[in-house]
Amino acid sequence: MNGFSTEEDSREGPPAAPAAAAPGYGQSCCLIEDGERCVRPAGNASFSKRVQKSISQKKLKLDIDKSVRHLYICDFHKNFIQSVRNKRKRKTSDDGGDSPEHDTDIPEVDLFQLQVNTLRRYKRHYKLQTRPGFNKAQLAETVSRHFRNIPVNEKETLAYFIYMVKSNKSRLDQKSEGGKQLE
């Protein structure tokens, strides 16, 4: 699911004959941007309640034209909405937020792809407080929330972490081996 519903989810009322054959055929985008109706041809993406909610949360100047009988939007607005939804707004620090660490174009790090043991190691290293018995999704969410809020260069930190794991120089690995050194 990408947040854009199918034509069955978003169709309201009886469809017109040409629109039923091909979504958006001969129709223009149903959105109004900055008070002006979009004239681009409508694609097969529709303006669902979920998309409308994300637009209102981001305070975008997009609205649906109430005079149209369809909910199809153009590819430009579809890509625009997806890109805005995928961008993560980072909190700026007291220094004005103009440092490279506070760039809003930094992609989201998907920590759910890490193994559970790695997430537990991260939690143990930073002494994060969690309830016992967290599943992987809850653990990844907790670690992700902490990871977003620590003031570090994320790329450098991950590179160093991977280097330490690959070179077997992790203190946690040495402790688990009962005191013998790893080569």
Curated annotation (Swiss-Prot):
Region spans: Disordered: 1-23, 85-105
A Pfam family: SAP30_Sin3_bdg
Cystines in this chain: C29-C30, C38-C74
Modification sites for N-acetylmethionine: M1
Location of the motif Nuclear localization signal (NLS): 86-91
GO BP of this protein: negative regulation of cell migration; negative regulation of stem cell population maintenance; negative regulation of transcription by RNA polymerase II; negative regulation of transforming growth factor beta receptor signaling pathway; positive regulation of stem cell population maintenance; regulation of DNA-templated transcription
Region: Important for DNA and phosphoinositide binding, residue numbers: 88-90
Comp. bias regions, Acidic residues: 1-10
Domain notes: The zinc-finger domain mediates direct interaction with DNA and phosphoinositol phosphates (phosphoinositol 3-phosphate, phosphoinositol 4-phosphate and phosphoinositol 5-phosphate). In vitro oxydation causes reversible disulfide bond formation between Cys residues in the zinc-finger domain and reversible loss of zinc ion binding.
Annotated family: Belongs to the SAP30 family.
Cross-link Glycyl lysine isopeptide (Lys-Gly) (interchain with G-Cter in SUMO2) per UniProt, renumbered positions: K49, K155, K166, K175
Tissue distribution: Detected in brain and ovary, and at lower levels in heart, small intestine, lung, kidney, skeletal muscle, stomach and spleen (at protein level). Ubiquitous; expressed in all tissues tested with highest levels in testis.
Start-end of Atypical zinc fingers: 29-77
GO cellular component, one term: histone deacetylase complex
List of residues that carry Phosphoserine: S93, S99
Keywords in alphabetical order: Acetylation, Disulfide bond, DNA-binding, Isopeptide bond, Lipid-binding, Metal-binding, Nucleus, Phosphoprotein, Repressor, Transcription, Transcription regulation, Ubl conjugation, Zinc, Zinc-finger
Any one GO MF annotation of this record: phosphatidylinositol-4-phosphate binding
Induction pattern: Up-regulated by TGFB1.
Entry protein name: Histone deacetylase complex subunit SAP30L
